[in-house]
């Protein structure tokens, strides 16, 4: 199969040019002007549009069981939504397994979840929910099998203590893996939450008040120091929501420490006032939404390069699930927001079209740096000969209002309802195959491939 994309502006992280792009047998074969491929081929006219590498979302939670509920997006509906939003690769954070299980247990479970459902290419982050000799011995074998990143939690049921974190950091570093972490101070959160519950303060706004930004920032600072103690182990902070944590990361970078950080559209564009609305329960996520001042600090990090990745933390529970389980109590509500379909459009509209970032920086945040950090470069995150033919075409002339009824996930609401975006996803290609075109999903379940990722190699800081 040959596909020729003509008349568009092809953008990579290191530059852009108005040129044609030829994909053949799922791979980018040529970029240039006046390409004349051998017949037969499909021609796509991208006049007036940007031609970007397909998005790489390195933080999703599909089909996750959080104990009180299972998320309503599986690997079909979740990756379908991703495809319709211009994302062609996801790396899913696997949920916790049974108490005491091996690392491999969850990999086998999740490969079963995705095998016949994923629309786009996918991989997984390992999850370390306890530490013992068997777990530490298993890590190098998992890296050899293509899982080169693992997640630790400093909160929730399977949080690790500092000694366990140090052991994990050392072994992951030795094994060629990147440590990712959910950083919140569990003890401080538990104390604040107990105070509010005892006082009968259980409305959604108290979710945010029970998890102040200092809980997140303290845990970030602690992880930075533990990573240094563990031999300058590489560290990746997920879903940053505040400026103080970003300050700590800037300081670590200034000291040449290998640390990277992601944020998410919700922390850039939504704020804590959402909790005081009639449907405030639908904005329960952790870390919580912050105030506009923290948003501005994150946008500074987006603009000046301090933030490396924009992912989604897509973790969808329906409003019916939320209301039935929580009964109005924030502490009982399952956490998470949908967003995998909206990431690329929201960042393009609020970043590129407002002049906050360049199209090249957009590529760096949404595909190139995620691919480099997580062992997929240059197969993903790049439009160059030899790379996969993963493409998203965005028309900056079109304006769209986000409406849940037009989205493709399995949620029954969107936190972005009514947002107007300048720029529309008009086509998504995965390995040269059109899987979304002009509002219509054209992919199929099971066409996505499991990606064996390369061991971690740090990008130049």
Curated annotation (Swiss-Prot):
The lineage of its organism: Bacteria, Pseudomonadati, Pseudomonadota, Gammaproteobacteria, Enterobacterales. This is D-phenylhydantoinase. Substrate binds at residues 156, 286, 335. One of its GO terms (biological process) is pyrimidine nucleobase catabolic process. A divalent metal cation 1 binds at residues 59, 61, 151, 313. SUPFAM superfamilies: Composite domain of metallo-dependent hydrolases, Metallo-dependent hydrolases. Pfam families: Amidohydro_1. It comes from Escherichia coli O17:K52:H18 (strain UMN026 / ExPEC). The keyword Hydrolase applies. One of its GO terms (cellular component) is cytosol. Carboxylation allows a single lysine to coordinate two divalent metal cations. Binds 2 divalent metal cations per subunit. The keyword Cell wall biogenesis/degradation does not apply.
